[in-house]
Amino acid sequence: IAQCLVGSEMCIRDRIPADMIQTIEVNKVVTPDMDADAIGGSINLITKNSPYKRTIAATAGTGYNWISEKAQLNLGFTYGDRFFNDKLGLMISASYQNSPSGSYDTEFTWEQGEDGKTYVNDYQIRQYYVTRERQSYSAALDWDINANHKLTFKGIFNNRNDWENRYRTNLKDLEADGSATVRIQTKAGTPDNRNARLERQRTMDFALGGEHLFGPFAMDWHASYAKASEERPNERYIDFQLKKQKFNVDLSNERQPFATPKDGSTMTLNDKFSLKELTEQQEDIKEQDLKFSANFKLPFKNGNKLKFGAKVVRKTKDKEVDFYEYSPLNEDAFMENSLKNTVDQSNKHFMPNNKYQAGIYAGKEYTGSLDLNNASLFEKEQVQEELAGNFEARETVSSGYVRFDQKITDRVELMSGLRIENTNLAYTGRTYDADEDITSKTERRHNSYINFLPSLLMKWNVNEDFKVRGSFTQTLSRPKYSALVPSVNIKRSDNEITIGNPELKPAMSYNFDLSADYYFRSIGLVSAGVFYKKIDDFIVNQISNNYEYQGNVYTRFTQPKNAGNANLFGIELSYQRDFSFIAPALKCIGFYGTYTYTHSRIEDFNFEGRENEEGLSMPGSPAHTANASLYFEKAGLNIRLSYNFASEFIDEMGESAFYDRYYDKVNYMDANASYTFGKKIKTTFYAEANNLLNQPLRYYQGTKDRTMQAEYYGVKVNAGVKINF
């Protein structure tokens, strides 16, 4: 699957429904015949292949989310068969999901006064309502020409629509004495988009391949075309403000700072407010991928094998945003009409704490119905600074590899190889001139580099049940497109600015892994491993507050940087087994668990003002992660309880440790159950519940108690029936 998220090189896994996936390949260690852009290993999503015999399956289900309080719809269908004496295989699938959801969110940023006292300088209450609709269609064909030659084709189309409304109350520029400007904002869209912000993401992938055998010599080839797009038509924001308000801010519990208006002040929309801004934007982002690869295998005596091949990947990505601000010609009449079309979003079930109440906002229907392009009602002006995030990027990665698999003895196998990747980049961004209020294209920038990536893997079969593996590999992590482009991305609604960095280098990783696996005679295994990674030039966002650019002061400034080098040490443990070793009657009960410990330290830290600071951990690297699953399987009944844990880790780095942002620890628990019966027609009833612990997305600033964001999504349940004919 080649579809990619706009602005990055991350595959869009949530765009593809789970029922369209046949298998998930996880590779902890990257071999020379795999793409090297995988410091932590690789994950490949394999869509459904054509079957060995006729297959007909249908799924129908529903679900419920406690925030949206609306039902979910899940539908799926699969048909597969073989034709012409089993020479031709066909599999077609379709999936549809409609999932209303939402979230309750509080966000804060913290500042330190000259007296050393800490206070909140930005305070937000947000409420989201989202409806996500997914449609997915896939087809797979294979043609067995003869015993030595086979052709395959796969195609998939995914369409994901997200309709989102957001209501936000913001105490902006909140000072230590409690003075602030109150901002009340509604995010909406036009009536043809349900009066909501529509984010339409479409991905398609078509792949043709062949497998051929010429005597002992084997080869395979693959050619693919992929296209991804993201459109946001008519995204609207209406924002009201009231200056010089006074608040009492209770910081006795820094996890939940709470502001209450002083006498004569308010944070509720009323006729004292004025229009801050009314905007509409169009966003269109497109990416195309062309790939071709060929692999050749030549066996030797004694089980040795030589494999070599080449691959070319050509990517193009364009981002285009158009942004307009509208001013009512009669602002008094506009404000009067706006205050007649409000909604109260206060909710006693607000999950961060019901003491936070979102309040009153302009209604989404009212915001969507505004005739903004009527010159007798509104003055229209294109906002040049918002166009500075547009870019065009081109990337070509040409690679070749050689891999030799050798049997040293009957029990020892060695794999050695070298991969060479040549990366060529060309990109054009935008610059914004505040004095002239114009945006212009930058000159096209070019960059190219070659990476030589050796690898060595060893496997020792101590006996049939005990295996020892060791490896050295070299991998890399390329910067995101949007990080490289010399552009300026300004979010006026949040007063934030992000600047690209064309000088970014790819992060390089030298990986050492050693593991031992013991397989039980009954189904199960226990394994232990250690690993070490030396990462050079890792990339992280540097954050600055109250940053001045082109004469404007922005609340938050972000720029990606090569921040230095890092060393990571870790251990991995896993255990999987049913309980039949205790008593045969317990064979139906089993346990699966994994645990990883990672110790990381940064060297040569080069952020301005923090050069060579010691004791810092690698961003994005939790010290502890664990997964556990307890299951029961018997007579068609399957029950599973799963738990996932990850400890906190640093996510973004600021001007000092006080401004560092951390992703807090998470505890997730899910449960699912199913019952299958029937022989010729198998019927399965299923039910599942996700996020049983109502785990929020939580960030904190500097110390654990200082909440930056706490966003709750609630528990989700699904149930339905699957029929296989």
Task: Pin down the residues of each PLM region.
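Single conserved hydrophobic/aromatic residue that forms the stacking wall/gate
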Residues: A2-G7
